[in-house]
Amino acid sequence: GRVTITVDGTPYDVSRSSVFDALPHVLYVPPGHDVTLEAAGDAEIAWGSAPAEGRLPVRLFTPGEMRREVRGGGPAVREVHHVLSHPLPAERLIVFEVYVPGGAWSGWPPHTHDGRIGSRYLEEVYYYRMQRPEAFALHRNYTREADLDEVLVVRDGDLVAVPGGFHPVAAAPGSNTYFLNFLAGDLVMEERAVPPVDDPDHAWIVDAWDEAPWTLPLPFGDDAPND
């Protein structure tokens, strides 16, 4: 959609046809400002907020300022867009967009930022969009202590909160998956660059992305019947 966001009388015109074929604009607004929004037709707006002291000015971040990277490897490859993460300035907010091909995993190795096992505390939400209306993904929230372990089936338009622990995502085959992350917590300004902490049980995978998976059929001997 196309939207005009007015901050203290100054208009900012932003538009995006779809999360699947265009990059976003982000308008950062500190506390104490008057904000109005006017949409030229149907539009979807993501609004995230976090406590702030107003150290930074109003600023419109454009797609050319946002770093893009391909993370992971093998069946856990995905594309991450640093929509509002360090070094782009904000007090507490961190924003990512992530694109996961159908059949792939994201957030792998699983990581945490809930204040446990040496991590810093950040709250996080996921907003999901699916390229096909029937598509779905699996979102797991769990802790090593097993006081939390839930698997959620997520579909287009679902919003998921991360109450703590690790939170990997698996896109079903054929289900190209997008999600928007808002994070905020103890990390302020440049501290927002501090990374999460990986699950020690699965951290080894970062050194083994190129290890070949099984080649099928498995070599169980020449006398094994084959279909």
Residue spans for each PLM region:
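Jelly-roll (double-stranded beta-helix
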Residues: 2-227
